[in-house]
From Swiss-Prot:
Residues 525-534, 552-572 have a biased composition (Polar residues). Keywords: Chromatin regulator, DNA damage, DNA repair, Nucleus, Repeat. Component of the BRCA1-A complex. Belongs to the RAP80 family. It comes from Xenopus tropicalis (Western clawed frog). Its main location: nucleus. SMART domains: UIM. GO terms for cellular component: BRCA1-A complex; nucleus. This is BRCA1-A complex subunit RAP80. It is found in: Nucleus.
Length: 572
């Protein structure tokens, strides 16, 4: 306990030395230091408690806790990424807004300064200039500057708070009206009231200046106005009846600038192409034929104001080589039967072969149809049925200014000439088509000759590969396997040992000296070795059956035993 108290006092002293508090009373210093120490001790205690809980938890609970922690981290990361994406989108929208608004505003502000100077000069000299009156049917409500800004806002910034932008534009328009036209107080108030009651802003429908007479038509809102207000508008128009030629020139300049700014506005209209343009894109134009897109422009101008019609109208004299688009056809099965490999007199062809011919002629890229490229077996028979000719006319509308009727006439003439000559060309699978300007018959003959040469060279190479093997040395029969000889030796030894034991038992035992025994051992060894050597030589020289070998061995053993018995019985 004493050690723990000393450690706590040392920690408190270190905390006091680290954090110096300047105050009037000593008690406040101690309280603040103690509070800070408690705040430090609290997170340490929490950590230890959390560690204890984790240690007490089972493995499954720990896994569940780890999964929860990972999910929380993933959600936090996803949320931060979403926030960053939103900030990027906002920044991009603001930059686009600044770019789109700055261009038309710069052009309009420069023009507004010119119009202000011109109108101030002209309105000051109203009494002197009475030559160019304005038609009373018009009502000068606003300059067209605000109209262009409003249109740009409606087209480009429809997603970025359009209501606030329109209100801002309206405030600008009111200030510009008051600056442009120095009107009497009553007329100005009436005009402001009229614009406040209206729900829609006036839109310019046409700007025309002819010989100083300014004729503008404005479409005012459809809200009903009282008779007093209409009279007030008439008074307003009569009060500002005279404008000089300078105002007309300024307005014409502004109309040109506003039209240029409208073309420059970055508005992209994604329109879907009509079926007519898609089908006509396969047509290749030439200077001889009529432009088929001229009739199309009148219909497309009202329905879809896309950029494709402008692109086509800009290039009426150039040959448009667009990507080929195949016309709609019924699903057909192509007959992929192999061609005849010999030149026959039959010139008949099926309808399926005619369909293949039609497709080949439609996909040709040359300026004129080259019928020498196509196989004559397909071109041999003329078109008998009317349906086939109709399909040809529908598929091949225009091809370099030459219609299908002329092409069919040319093909018929070619067929007649081929019939007169009597030569037919048969293309084979794998043989390329004849190039332009060469005789197809000679071309096929050359290729067939090349194929023959290739086959002959292959045969020669194969003959060289197939070589006969020379006969080797004759195979001699080998001696009988060693296993049989080893087994025979083992059997002979066993039989010898058994017979020798039997013979010893039968004979009566006699006392024999040690010297006799010693003399008998080398004799027996010599006899056994001599008996084994001829037996082995006999076995190696001629293969004998197992039974014969056993009989011979038994006879030899008996003979040797008899000799041994006689030698032992003889006295020394």
């Amino acid at each position: 306990m004493g050690c723990r108290g000393q450690n706590c006092s040392e920690k408190r002293r270190a905390i006091r030395d680290h954090f110096i508090v300047i105050s009037d009373s000593e008690g406040e210093e101690e309280k603040e230091v103690i509070r800070f120490g408690k705040n430090i001790a609290q997170p340490d205690g929490r950590r230890t408690s959390v560690k204890r809980k984790i240690a007490q938890m089972t493995e499954e609970e720990q896994l569940a806790l780890a999964v929860r922690m990972s999910e929380q981290e993933a959600n936090h990361v996803n949320y931060s990424q979403e926030e960053e994406d939103e900030l990027l989108r906002k920044a991009i929208e603001e930059s686009l807004h600044s770019c789109t608004v700055s261009e038309p505003c710069n052009t309009t502000t420069q023009q507004n300064t010119n119009t202000l100077h011109s109108t101030n000069r002209t309105l000051a000299a109203e009494d002197c200039s009475e030559k160019h009156p304005i038609s009373q049917n018009c009502s000068l409500s606003e300059p067209p500057n605000n109209i262009t800004v409003q249109q740009v806002y409606k087209e480009t910034l429809s997603t970025n708070e359009p209501v606030k932008l329109q209100e801002h534009a309206e405030e600008k328009s009111f200030s510009q009206v008051s600056a442009l036209f120095e009107l009497p107080s009553g007329a100005a108030e009436q005009q402001m009231n009229k614009e406040a009651h209206s729900t829609e802003r006036p839109v310019v429908t046409g700007d025309v200046v002819e010989e100083g007479h300014l004729s503008q038509t404005f479409t005012v809102s459809e809200t009903p106005l009282s008779a007093t207000q209409e009279m007030n508008t008439e008074d307003f128009t009569t009060s500002a009846t005279f404008v000089t030629e300078e105002v007309g020139e300024a307005l014409t300049q502004y109309s040109t600038v506003s039209s240029q700014s409208r073309h420059k506005s970055p508005v992209v209209l994604l329109m879907r192409l009509s079926q007519d343009i898609v089908e006509s894109s396969s047509v290749i134009l030439s200077p001889k034929c009529r432009d088929p897109f001229s009739d199309m422009e009148s219909g497309m101008a009202s329905s879809c104001p896309s950029n494709s019609s402008n692109f086509v109208s800009m290039l009426p004299h150039k040959a448009l080589t667009l990507s080929p688009v195949f016309p709609k056809q019924l699903p057909r099965r192509l007959g992929l039967s192999p061609r005849k490999l010999f030149q026959g007199a039959s010139l008949t062809s099926d309808s399926k072969e005619q369909e293949v011919d039609d497709q080949c002629s439609h996909c040709s890229e040359s300026s004129e149809l080259d019928y020498s490229v196509l196989p004559n077996s397909l071109q041999a028979e003329p078109f008998k049925s009317n349906t086939a000719t109709e399909v040809l006319k529908e598929n091949n509308t225009l091809l370099n200014g030459v219609t299908t009727e002329e092409q069919t006439g040319a093909s018929n003439s070619c067929l007649d000439s081929q019939r007169q000559s009597g030569s037919t060309v048969h293309y084979y699978w794998g043989v390329p088509f004849c190039p332009k300007g060469e005789d197809p018959n000679l071309y096929t003959q050359v290729i067939l000759c090349q194929l023959e040469v290739y086959e002959k060279s292959l045969k020669k190479a194969q003959r060289q590969l197939l070589r006969k093997m020379n006969f080797g040395e004759p195979v001699q029969l080998s001696a009988p396997p060693l296993r049989r000889t080893e087994r025979g030796k083992a059997d002979s030894q066993d039989s010898l040992s058994q017979e020798s034991e039997d013979l010893k038992d039968e004979d009566s035992p006699r006392p024999v000296d040690d010297e006799e025994v010693d003399s008998e051992k080398p004799m027996n060894q010599c006899v056994s070795s001599s008996s084994r050597q001829p037996a082995e030589s006999l076995e190696e020289e001629s293969p004998i059956p197992a039974q014969d070998e056993q009989d011979n061995n038994s006879q030899l053993i008996l003979f040797l035993n008899m000799n041994n018995s006689h030698s032992t019985s003889l006295p020394l």
